[in-house]
Regions:
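Residues embedded in well-ordered secondary-structure elements
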Residues: 15, 58, 145-147, 268, ...
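N-terminal secretory signal peptides that target proteins for export/translocation
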Residues: 1-9
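Extracellular zinc-dependent metalloprotease catalytic-domain scaffold
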Residues: 26-182, 187-288
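Bacterial N-terminal signal peptides
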Residues: 10-23
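Short, composition-biased motifs enriched in small/polar/acidic residues
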Residues: 288-368
Length: 368
């Protein structure tokens, strides 16, 4: 989903279209920071980045549930983050019926059209699926408490010394804390494959694991596995390399960095996209991104400065430009970008925005 605001800028007079709308949010994620984080000299930055990730999910999903997560630091070499979670076995027929009752989006409709009715799951043919505690509540099944320490739905470990703690300054040799937190939150909420557990009764995301020919696949052999709602549109490629999570995205060759990648790309700052579709499909209620408002536009020489509000916390916005408003948006040129913190306010500076040969130039603000 993309959120776009357009405005036109002439040489003399800037005109902005201000559109602000915010859907009511209901998902609540309650973090607990253990002493390894609170005693860290960079605790304030670490906690702020974690809270930015949490606010992102609370803004994008409307499920009226509370999810509790314990955050702690780890020192395992080569590992940026990990998560622990608790699941229960429930019947496939119950899970599918609850997905049907909870369906709210086009993703849900398409996914359900390709999940057969009946008692047998389409992956292994057994009558069972494994569903994590947060995911159970998202589809309306309450009372199944986590057996993790403190009763948390998840415990997330973060190797903060190997991560860029904020996006204000990027060390190209480190991973991204925000994306790492989002990766692990996705797994606490329900993403993962039970291929990591040796196979057997699947986790919900395994119901959407297809080969490139459109057949369901549930094997660690080969390198042909994709996340898809229908077996036709291949949304993301699953990792098939042993030693990395089979529920993560493929990184064995050239690829565009994503949050759920099996191996993070140092220096990159991916935001959740395909991961949101996956969470929507397994039972969460995805909301449109909030529409940002442009509160002020100023021109300093040829430099355009945009100030806005109501941006998506944890989101990255692009400024696109064209001299012809009728040009398809995918043909506009990206000229500036910025990351939005927890308060939703943002400032984006566009260099060389205008020149004396143009009567007008159009700009669009797009959520990356």
């Amino acid at each position: 989903m993309k959120t776009i605001s357009k405005f036109v800028f002439g040489r003399l007079l800037p005109v902005a279209i201000l559109i602000t709308a915010m859907s009511a949010q209901a998902l609540v994620i309650v973090p607990t920071f253990d002493s390894s984080i609170t005693s860290d000299p960079n605790a304030a930055t670490i906690e702020s980045t974690i809270n930015t990730a949490i606010q992102f999910y609370e803004t994008r999903f409307s499920d009226p549930i509370t999810v509790t997560i314990l955050f702690q630091e780890i020192t395992t070499s080569g590992l940026y983050g990990h998560s622990s979670w608790w699941y229960y076995n429930i019947s496939y027929s119950t899970y599918r019926a609850d997905l049907q009752a909870d369906a709210t989006t086009a993703n849900d409709t398409l996914a359900l059209a390709h999940l057969p009715t009946g008692s047998a799951n389409p992956v292994t043919g057994s009558n069972t699926v494994r569903v994590k505690t947060a995911n159970l509540r998202a589809i309306g099944i309450n009372g199944d408490n986590s057996g993790l320490a403190g009763g948390h739905d998840g415990i997330i470990g973060l190797h903060t010394s190997q991560l860029n703690l904020s996006r204000a300054s990027i060390n190209p040799g480190k991973g991204d804390l925000l994306a790492t937190v989002e990766h692990e939150i996705d797994e606490v909420l329900g993403l993962s494959s039970w291929l990591d557990g040796g196979g057997g009764d699947p986790l919900p995301e395994d119901l959407f694991r297809y080969s490139s020919t459109g057949a369901r696949t549930y094997t660690t052999s080969g390198d042909d596995a994709y996340f898809s709602l229908d077996g036709v549109t291949l949304i993301a490629r699953f990792n098939q390399t042993a030693g990395s999570d089979y529920g993560d995205w493929w990184t064995a060759g050239a690829h565009t960095p994503q949050v759920q990648d099996a191996n993070a790309t140092n220096g990159s700052t991916p935001d959740p996209k395909n991961e949101l579709i996956a969470l929507d499909a397994i039972g969460y209620n995805l909301l449109p991104a909030p529409r940002p408002g442009i509160s002020r536009i100023t021109l300093n020489g040829t430099q355009l400065v945009l100030k806005g509000t109501n941006g998506l916390a944890g989101g990255t916005y692009l400024v696109l430009t064209s001299t012809n408003a009728a040009t398809p948006l995918n043909q506009w040129t990206a000229v500036a970008t910025n990351f939005v913190g927890t308060n939703g306010n943002f400032t984006i500076t566009v260099p060389n925005a205008v020149n004396s040969t143009e009567a007008k130039r159009f700009f669009a603000l797009e959520l990356q």
